[in-house]
């Protein structure tokens, strides 16, 4: 492993953004610091009283886990105190968040504090996903919901942190995708995956097939297709589904394959959150040479209309996603 810290690497990336005068370095360093705080508690979750539910329900209609709430508070407090973000949005909060010292901020932060948290009680990998936008206006005091509801292609940075057998942080600023592994002996994220490029096609698919009866005909035909025996096209594919989006996405990013969360009868507009999950992962995926759509349109081109907007998601290796789109659009 290279002894290049994430701070040094981000500083080197700053040359691509001279107009930010060092701000981008500070923004991503803030996120990395918050991730260290969350990581500290995730690895101790079974030893302290932060497993289980709080008894509350979030805006998504889901029961709030204690660790969800802890991670959410840590990120807001750790990042908000530095005055670089004028406004935030979290999957766990109903509305926008105005952090302390927001009057000096020039950016908006959107994040899922603990993706896959339903798995934490059984020690399955979970993660934090984040997305950063520049404010539309010049006055931080006037930051509003509109600053959060920007197209995905307007992101200036995005990334995620996986808390698993090791802790890995992956980020992009629009100039490639880079991964860092946390070394607990020195308390630093060190460069471990430079310039990640996802394979053009893979051999894995990730989907909750327990919902097969809820899928539309296009999705069902696609699943039948990738299970057929055809060595010439690398079929059949193998299923790899953890149930933690960030973990499934990370594996497919490195090995090739596709993650699918299609529309269902119960959730015709999809279930994943556009602003907290789909947009940041789509930005990363495209920067690594992959593709991300809702089955019909590019994820990064979607115009958000609400903070907690949902979307179907087809994301991963370019060739695999294109085939899935053809089935979804009735072209196969």
UniProtKB/Swiss-Prot annotation:
Keyword terms, alphabetized: Calvin cycle, Carbohydrate metabolism, Cytoplasm, Hydrolase, Magnesium, Metal-binding
Reactions this protein catalyses: beta-D-fructose 1,6-bisphosphate + H2O = beta-D-fructose 6-phosphate + phosphate
Cofactor remark: Binds 2 magnesium ions per subunit.
GO molecular function: fructose 1,6-bisphosphate 1-phosphatase activity; magnesium ion binding
SUPFAM superfamilies assigned to the protein according to its UniProt record, in alphabetical order: Carbohydrate phosphatase (SSF56655)
Cellular localization per UniProt: Cytoplasm
Cofactor annotation: Mg(2+)
GO terms of biological process kind: fructose 1,6-bisphosphate metabolic process; fructose 6-phosphate metabolic process; fructose metabolic process; gluconeogenesis; reductive pentose-phosphate cycle; sucrose biosynthetic process
Residues binding Mg(2+) 1: 91, 112, 114
Main location: cytoplasm
Binding annotation for Mg(2+) 2: 112, 115, 277
Enzyme Commission identifier(s): 3.1.3.11
Pathway: Carbohydrate biosynthesis; Calvin cycle
Coiled-coil parts of chain: none
InterPro entries in alphabetical order: FBPase_C_dom, FBPase_class-1, FBPase_N, FBPtase
PANTHER family: FRUCTOSE-1,6-BISPHOSPHATASE-RELATED, SEDOHEPTULOSE-1,7-BISPHOSPHATASE, CHLOROPLASTIC
Binding partners and assembly: Homotetramer.
Protein name as catalogued: Fructose-1,6-bisphosphatase class 1
Origin species: Chlorobium phaeobacteroides (strain DSM 266 / SMG 266 / 2430)
Gene that produces this protein: fbp
């Amino acid at each position: 492993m290279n002894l290049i810290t994430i701070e040094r690497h981000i500083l080197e990336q700053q040359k691509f953004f001279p107009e930010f005068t060092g701000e981008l370095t500070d923004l991503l360093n803030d996120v990395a610091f918050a991730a260290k705080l969350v990581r500290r508690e995730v690895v101790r979750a079974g030893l302290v009283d932060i497993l289980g539910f709080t008894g509350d329900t979030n805006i998504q209609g889901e029961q709030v886990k204690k660790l969800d709430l802890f991670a959410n508070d840590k990120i807001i407090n750790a990042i908000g105190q530095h005055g670089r973000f004028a406004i935030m949005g979290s999957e766990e909060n109903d509305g926008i968040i105005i952090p302390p010292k927001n009057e000096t901020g020039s950016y908006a932060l959107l994040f899922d504090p603990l993706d896959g948290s339903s798995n934490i009680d059984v020690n399955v990998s979970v993660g934090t996903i984040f997305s950063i936008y520049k404010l539309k206006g010049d006055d931080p005091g006037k930051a509003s919901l509109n600053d959060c509801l920007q197209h995905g292609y307007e992101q200036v940075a995005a990334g995620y942190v996986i808390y698993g057998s090791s802790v890995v942080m992956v980020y992009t600023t629009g100039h490639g995708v880079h991964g860092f592994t946390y070394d607990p002996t020195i308390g630093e994220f060190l460069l471990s995956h430079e310039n990640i490029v996802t394979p053009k096609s893979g051999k894995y698919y990730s989907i909750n097939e327990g919902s097969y009866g809820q899928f539309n005909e296009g999705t069902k035909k696609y699943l039948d297709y990738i299970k057929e025996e055809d060595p010439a096209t690398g079929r059949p594919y193998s299923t790899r589904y953890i149930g933690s989006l960030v973990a499934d996405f990370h594996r497919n990013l490195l090995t090739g394959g596709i993650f699918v969360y299609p529309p269902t009868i119960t959730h015709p507009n999809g279930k994943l959150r556009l602003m907290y999950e789909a947009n940041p992962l789509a930005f990363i995926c495209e920067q690594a040479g992959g593709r991300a759509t809702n089955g019909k349109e590019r994820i990064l081109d979607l115009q958000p209309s609400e903070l907690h907007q949902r979307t179907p998601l087809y994301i991963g290796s370019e060739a695999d996603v294109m085939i899935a789109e053809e089935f979804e659009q009735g072209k196969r």
